[in-house]
Amino acid sequence: MANKVKYGLSNCYYAVYDETAGTYGTPVAMPGAVNLSLDQEGDTNKFRADNIDYYVSISNNGYSGDLELALVPDSFRTDVMGETVDSTSGLQYEVADANPKAFALLFQFEGDDHATRHVLYYCKASRPTLASQTTEETIEPVTETINLTATAIIKTVGGASKPLVKAKCKPTDTAYSTFFTAVQLPAAT
């Protein structure tokens, strides 16, 4: 049965992409996923002739938006954002000229019939927000947000190079059971 609706966000992971080897590291959990909101990027171009839209082209430039977490894990800050932990003092510090690494983002949406697992293959992130507030009569958690850009990455699929942006699978698909143990790539067209 197909889902009629989707809701929820869980099982959020990142997997660092090795630009030289063209491979992904093992996915690392990012617990505390609150919200994922990504807008499509791209343009629609219309060529007018004969008083009609004679030719229409649509570009797919991926997605951009926000991932909100209870707290951004320290592992993400070091693995992806380039923060460093001082071996003597234990201080974890941010370096102004650090170059964030590319990564795959894996996550799951629930549905009325089944969960659907998603992967964005080539993401870049900006530094997380830094904020908090005083405690009043009740404790109100303050979340952290990462701005994301997800674009295409060239991978071989069925013997041909294809610009992959994202993929998804449902429980009946072969990739589902091992989805969060390694970044799943399509094998054939």
Regions found by a protein language model. Give the residues of each.
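Repeat-unit-sized solenoid/scaffold elements
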Residues: M1-V5, V80-E83, E94-Q108, T134-T149, ...
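Solvent-exposed edge beta-strands and adjacent loop segments
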Residues: A2-R77, A125-T143
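Short linear sequence motifs
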Residues: Y7, Q40, F47, A96, ...
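Serine/threonine-rich low-complexity intrinsically disordered regions
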Residues: D18, D43, D86, T172-D173
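Short amphipathic beta-strand/extended segments with alternating polar/hydrophobic composition
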Residues: G25-P31, R117-C123, L164-K170
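Structured, beta-strand-rich domain cores
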Residues: Y55-S57, N61-Y121
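Mixed-charge, glycine-accented linear interaction segment located at domain edges/termini
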Residues: A125-T189
